[in-house]
């Protein structure tokens, strides 16, 4: 009943790095799937509203696909450790 240390270290590092990178990935996806923002400026009695477009917007057709990236990322974070853990379990 010998437990290999390399796969366990790999799992721990994989999960920690994966969790650490989820925030930035989600932030970038939100940035490229947002077409722009509305800005309202109030000066005295005059209110001006304008739309500021996002130059990094990927378009409405691609935004649907790009919005799925965090979901697939989470699936990889779940499936890879599960497969490695299953292989470790079957070796014993």
Swiss-Prot record:
It holds the Pfam family VP1_VP3. Its main location: virion. The keyword Disulfide bond does not apply. The chain crosses the membrane at residues 8-28, 65-85. It comes from the Viruses. It is found in: Virion membrane. One of its GO terms (molecular function) is structural molecule activity. Keywords: Capsid protein, Membrane, Transmembrane, Transmembrane helix, Virion. The keyword Transcription regulation does not apply. It is a multi-pass membrane protein. GO terms for cellular component: membrane; viral capsid; virion membrane. Belongs to the fuselloviridae capsid protein VP1/VP3 family. This is Structural protein VP3.
């Amino acid at each position: 009943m010998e437990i290999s240390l390399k796969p366990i270290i790999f799992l721990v590092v994989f999960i920690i790095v994966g969790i650490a990178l989820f925030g930035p990935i989600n932030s970038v996806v939100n940035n490229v799937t947002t077409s722009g923002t509305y800005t309202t400026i109030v000066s005295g009695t005059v209110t001006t509203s304008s739309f500021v477009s996002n130059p990094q917007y990927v378009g409405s057709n691609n935004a649907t696909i790009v919005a799925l990236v965090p979901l697939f990322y989470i699936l990889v974070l779940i499936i890879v450790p599960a497969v490695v853990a299953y292989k470790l379990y079957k070796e014993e």
